[in-house]
Amino acid sequence: MSIKEQTLMTPYLQFDRNQWAALRDSVPMTLSEDEIARLKGINEDLSLEEVAEIYLPLSRLLNFYISSNLRRQAVLEQFLGTNGQRIPYIISIAGSVAVGKSTTARVLQALLSRWPEHRRVELITTDGFLHPNQVLKERGLMKKKGFPESYDMHRLVKFVSDLKSGVPNVTAPVYSHLIYDVIPDGDKTVVQPDILILEGLNVLQSGMDYPHDPHHVFVSDFVDFSIYVDAPEDLLQTWYINRFLKFREGAFTDPDSYFHNYAKLTKEEAIKTAMTLWKEINWLNLKQNILPTRERASLILTKSANHVVEEVRLRK
């Protein structure tokens, strides 16, 4: 069955791995094995083959979209007789905890910045826009981190709105996973990038996801291209537990770590703790607030074992 026949009743074109890999065309590999190793997450296998077959075709597609967007901006400037401000192209990356959003974001940042146009690519995570722990404690939301009510959505929307309005210097708060909190006075300044990659659980959410805090403009209103990284729930749980175990032997051993006490757990205790955290917080957030946004994405990457992408769906 052809791609066209497969997708008559869906807004997406569906590609298996081989079909998608063929769309790389002649795009050269610009990352070395060592660079790829530095880009991968703590619990992920990221091979040269994965970058070549999945991310190079995606970077080629994005380059087409970005070039088209720049031409459209030039037409508007010609019509208005103005010299337009630099308006960044915004790419959002959503998906569950432990699915590998951050790795996808870092790989795309590296690839897009190495196209011949030498575009400047900034990467921001929405973790920085979580309310500080003090606020979450006051509101009884410490066990709801990552849920819609835990974010300062007004600040996040203002951040992307300012960027799209051409504001030259825009600041974003920075989150530390070591202290499990927003870093006080740790803002990062973003200076007119050509491309902004915005990575987070909530970047595809809209008004229906924020009944507790009604407002009329959302992050998704400013996004030019959105990606959802998907995987079966059993794999997500396994990846989350494995990541927790690696943190137990690594980051959690730091005395400054918010979760330092977890480093003292036995492996069996750590697995039990991770499963509880997954079921009571992360799985619940996935089912209620993250997975329902998947079909809003421009492109869906579906992973199988070992974080290997086996299917790509591209909105028509």
Swiss-Prot record:
E.C. numbers: 2.7.1.33
Pathway per the UniProt entry: Cofactor biosynthesis; coenzyme A biosynthesis; CoA from (R)-pantothenate: step 1/5
The keyword Metal-binding appears for this protein: no
InterPro entries hit by this protein: P-loop_NTPase, PanK, PRK/URK
Keywords of this entry: ATP-binding, Coenzyme A biosynthesis, Cytoplasm, Kinase, Nucleotide-binding, Transferase
Catalytic activities: (R)-pantothenate + ATP = (R)-4'-phosphopantothenate + ADP + H(+)
Main localisation: cytoplasm
GO MF assignments: ATP binding; pantothenate kinase activity
SUPFAM superfamilies assigned: P-loop containing nucleoside triphosphate hydrolases
Family: Belongs to the prokaryotic pantothenate kinase family.
HAMAP family cross-referenced by the UniProt entry: Pantothen_kinase_1
Protein name: Pantothenate kinase
Source species taxonomy: Bacteria, Pseudomonadati, Pseudomonadota, Gammaproteobacteria, Enterobacterales
Gene: coaA
